[in-house]
Regions:
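Extended ligand-binding regions for polar small-molecule ligands
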Residues: 11-17, 24-27, 101-135
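Short, well-ordered beta-strand core segments
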Residues: 28-29, 46, 67
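Periplasmic-binding protein-like
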Residues: 1-6, 79-119, 138-142
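Short helices/loops that flank or line small-molecule/ion binding pockets
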Residues: 53-73, 80-81
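Ligand-binding clefts/hinges and TM-proximal coupling segments of bilobed small-molecule sensing domains
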Residues: 34-50, 86, 119-142
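Acidic, polar ligand-binding/catalytic clefts
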Residues: 1-23, 33-36, 90-93
Length: 142
């Protein structure tokens, strides 16, 4: 599966936006604790903000140029705080692969073993493929 990372910016910047390169030498913000650093070079000025409401306020007041977040969270925040605001533009920026993670404990290792065994049995079944199709997701296994 993937985590779709999107960027939000003010409409006045739309003509200048050319994807990830557009973030260079700009003020870019995301939720505190997220780690988008590995996907961008050091030319961006990063602001880590505690909540999405503040991120949107900063964007509206031109205190940041771009706001990065998971698409689903960004859409929710826009619908919650600025539902009819056409001055905020959202574009998809990155697709990050998702992997299950288990804690490095005895219980976590047991869960990892169960996950690996059961996924090995069900991943190529018709039932699994039907489940992905039912919810409109692309089947991720070759």
């Amino acid at each position: 599966d993937i985590d779709l990372i999107s960027v939000m910016f003010n409409k006045k910047s739309l003509s200048h936006f050319q994807g990830p390169e557009s973030l260079k030498n700009r003020r870019v913000a995301w939720i505190k604790g997220y780690d988008f650093h590995p996907y961008f070079d050091d030319s961006i000025t990063v602001f880590e903000i505690a909540n999405r409401k503040s991120l949107l306020r900063m964007l509206k007041k031109d205190r940041i140029d771009y706001y990065l977040d998971a698409r689903v969270d960004m859409d929710f925040a826009k619908d919650e705080y600025h539902p009819n605001d056409e001055s905020l533009i959202v574009r998809d920026l990155l697709s990050l692969k998702l992997y299950p993670a288990f804690s490095d404990t005895k219980k976590g290792k047991a869960l990892t073993k169960i996950w690996d065994q059961r996924m090995g049995k069900i991943k190529d079944t018709k039932k699994m493929k039907d489940l992905f199709a039912q919810w409109g997701f692309e089947y991720p296994f070759p």
